[in-house]
């Protein structure tokens, strides 16, 4: 069993007196959680479109809408091939997507290209909740929403023979496991790991490393327990955890994904601070599983972090 927590003695993190640094740190955490999704989608787009896209250039490459229109046209061609081979149960949109390929970033034409892509997504069946605003792409204001939209497009496209992004492949893998496997019994003592010994499994070792950083020193510990390959009990929940491209440890949460490190920041009480609205004082969360009803209305929770100076926060 892997247990992780922060000792109150060594706990550090931005408080109300450090709100500027805290805001910067929080933004860096959001970006860190988004990075695996960007990398996965960049690789998917590169393979589909033959244009090199990276996580670093993701929004910049897409922001004039031209590559998205090209993506729609490419996916349509693959749909047509699938329809010729198998009669689909649903009629798919096959139409010319108006696009100005040379549209400057930030221009009206960039917005028009993006709007045309979004219109095509609606025709395809992408739910309104998965779409982004044209401005959100053009002005780089909604990177997460752009990623979620493309993932949903990948899910739909995969039904018609289009190679999906890596995260969608992992979703299919989990769905198959849930369909084929019966409920697993409680793990035997031999399935629990402790100390620094390596399990020899890349995923298990990565989960162990993340859950034990920083080292646990609290008497009441938040536990991460391996139940079976890729299946863990984290706190009070049983979760599927996967390694994306042998690099990122991802948790299947609801209908989406989150980094394991990001999940722990939100759900491990030992990684949170309780801040008083009255005097601004911070204190550790004492409850093993804090809920809003357990908290004083004059307090609120923030995640804790090792403090970084402003110049160190990227």
UniProtKB/Swiss-Prot annotation:
Expressed in most tissues. Highest levels in liver, lung and kidney. In the embryo strongly expressed in regions that undergo extensive apoptosis, such as the intervertebral tissues, the cranofacial mesenchyme and the cartilage of the limbs. Expressed in the inner ear, in inner and outer pillar cells (at protein level). Keywords: Apoptosis, Cell cycle, Cell shape, Cytoplasm, Cytoskeleton, Growth arrest, Membrane, Phosphoprotein. Residues 189-198 have a biased composition (Low complexity). Residues 35-157 form the Calponin-homology (CH) domain. CDD domains: CH_GAS2. SUPFAM superfamilies: Calponin-homology domain, CH-domain (SSF47576), GAS2 domain-like (SSF143575). It comes from the Eukaryota. It is found in: Cytoplasm, Cytoskeleton, Stress fiber; Membrane. The modification Phosphoserine is found at residues 184, 188. PANTHER family: GROWTH ARREST-SPECIFIC PROTEIN 2, TRANSGELIN. Belongs to the GAS2 family. This is Growth arrest-specific protein 2.
